[in-house]
UniProtKB/Swiss-Prot annotation:
The keyword Transmembrane helix does not apply. The keyword Transcription regulation applies. It is found in: Cytoplasm. GO terms for biological process: regulation of DNA-templated transcription. Keywords: Cytoplasm, DNA-binding, Transcription, Transcription regulation. PANTHER family: TRANSCRIPTIONAL REGULATORY PROTEIN YEBC-RELATED, TRANSLATIONAL ACTIVATOR OF CYTOCHROME C OXIDASE 1. Belongs to the TACO1 family. InterPro entries: Integrase-like_N (IPR017856), TACO1_YebC-like_2nd/3rd_dom (IPR048300), TACO1_YebC_N (IPR049083), Transcrip_reg_TACO1-like (IPR002876), Transcrip_reg_TACO1-like_dom3 (IPR026564), YebC-like (IPR029072). HAMAP family: Transcrip_reg_TACO1 (MF_00693). This is Probable transcriptional regulatory protein Acel_1346. GO terms for molecular function: DNA binding. GO terms for cellular component: cytosol.
Length: 248
């Protein structure tokens, strides 16, 4: 069985079809604008911005778009949007808990779109706090194995604040407190270990095992939510079979 982290990592490696690439670009640009607004336009002194830029470049977002997003976010160019972060909570098929992260300039529009998408795909909204307690905010770094053992990775990050290293199959997941994420990332780089992504994420404390049919319904719901313009990320506490994961 595989959890959300392995599913998200597998999905990240798949090519994004043209119909969805525009939405992906928009989400990546939003992240850059917000990071520049909060921490300033210099990625050397703003690790959140540096990570947002790296993710955008990994998805082939043009450099000009990236630079303009930085300037807008930092107030150096007109046209910046005052994005508001919101987290919605809900349940999917099989009782799976969902945290839905949004960045929006219209709270009412975001709430309506998320609620409609949940209802149409077998989900339901939940009251604030009724789902969030099932997740912990963690720093998550995904490291491709590339011939390395779990002990190799653990040795590189243990003194940097890493809490654990999990085997995801083709990669390792390094977990830390959010405040230690930059130190963990830098420790990997110093050891010559490449990482695929470094994010602050919601990690479930308990996973719900799903049969294959329910798992497919949950993944369809998450995909529909991720297609919403205001939704940046969706987190869920499920275990699904490797057979269903292979269909992603």
């Amino acid at each position: 069985m595989s959890g959300h982290s392995k599913w998200a990592t597998t999905k990240h490696k798949k090519a994004v079809i043209d119909a969805r690439r525009g939405k992906l670009f928009a989400k990546l640009i939003k992240n850059i604008e917000v990071a520049a607004r909060v921490g300033g336009p210099d990625p050397n002194g703003n690790p959140t911005l540096a990570d947002a830029i790296a993710k955008a470049r990994d998805q082939s977002v043009p450099n000009d778009n990236i630079e303009r997003a930085i300037r807008r976010g930092a107030g150096l160019e007109a046209g910046g949007t005052d994005w508001e972060p919101i987290i919605y909570e809900g349940y999917g098929p099989g009782g799976v808990a969902l945290l839905i992260e949004c960045l929006t300039d219209n709270r009412n529009r975001a709430a309506s779109e998320v609620r409609t998408t949940m209802t149409r795909n077998g989900g339901s909204m939940a009251d604030p706090g009724s789902v969030a307690y099932l997740f912990n905010r963690k720093g998550i770094v995904i490291v491709p194995k590339e011939g390395r053992s779990e002990d190799d990775v653990l040795a590189a990050v243990l003194d940097a604040g890493a809490e654990e290293v999990n085997d995801l199959g083709e990669s390792f997941e390094v977990v830390s407190e959010p405040g230690d994420l930059t130190r963990v990332r830098d420790a990997l780089s110093a050891a010559g270990i490449r990482y695929e992504s470094a994010d602050v994420a919601w990690q479930p404390t308990v996973n719900v095992p799903l049969d294959d049919d329910t798992a497919r319904k949950v993944l369809r719901l998450i995909e529909a939510l991720e297609d919403c313009d205001d939704v940046q990320a969706v987190w869920a506490n499920f275990d699904i079979s490797d057979a269903v994961l292979a269909e992603v």
